[in-house]
Amino acid sequence: MEKKKLSLPAQIFIALLLGIVVGLAFYFMGKPEITTNYLKPFGTIFVNLLKFIVVPVVLLSMIDGIVSMGDMKKVGSVGWKTVAYFLVTTAIACVIGLVFANIFNNAGLFPTLQLVDGQVWEKATSANFMDTLIGIFPSNLWESFRTSNMLQVIVIAILLGGGILTAGEKGKLAQDMVTSLYAVIERVMAFIISLSPIGVFTMMAWVVATQGPEILGSLGIVLGCAYLGYIVHAVLCYSVSAKAFAGINPIDRKSVV
């Protein structure tokens, strides 16, 4: 009888628990530097890989989707709706995050972080509407990729996808190339995601070993706040979007199936 392989979420959960155990062991042994020198680098590599894959996935998936429409009128309509949807959902996420952060902070549930000696906390400055609008449009392709500016990446994808469509037969090679590259990047993304247990284990072991067991309570509170925010955001944005754009009732299981 073939053994059933553990699902990825189960592997991540086990890695989380093992990371806590290993981190506590090194903390009480008084050797947290071992996790810093030999475990944290692997966690950093995993985080770097996640950052690396985001832009190619968004860019190629959008170009592939736009090209598959085959109609520039649809591209224009979908393009501005995508940008508008991104801005609205991001704004809602920011508001939810600020509300939950203030509630938890005023209740004294969040840990207080101490600044390193000599470090200065710089207050964020708000940009006006026109600056935000200008910032959506890229001036340098590679700079948009380097900074992972998702709005600019979306605009680049819309422009390139529209260019491929309007090029007609001459754009066929580019279309085939995008489809092939997207298939490849999907495989790369699947591989990186499969490394999640390693990333979770190494980072959790390092955090617990260097911060001590008291960090577990703080992390639990922060994660709890984050997941509450995710749930509220999903209900407000994605459930409403499913009903508005696809006519799907998220509460009715039959309509989803």
Region locations from a protein language model:
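Conserved small/polar residues in nucleotide/adenosyl-binding loops
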Residues: 256
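Perimembrane loop-to-helix junctions flanking transmembrane segments
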Residues: 34-44
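Signature of multi-pass transmembrane helix bundles
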Residues: 3, 9, 13, 20-32, ...
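Small-residue-rich hydrophobic transmembrane alpha-helices
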Residues: 57-64
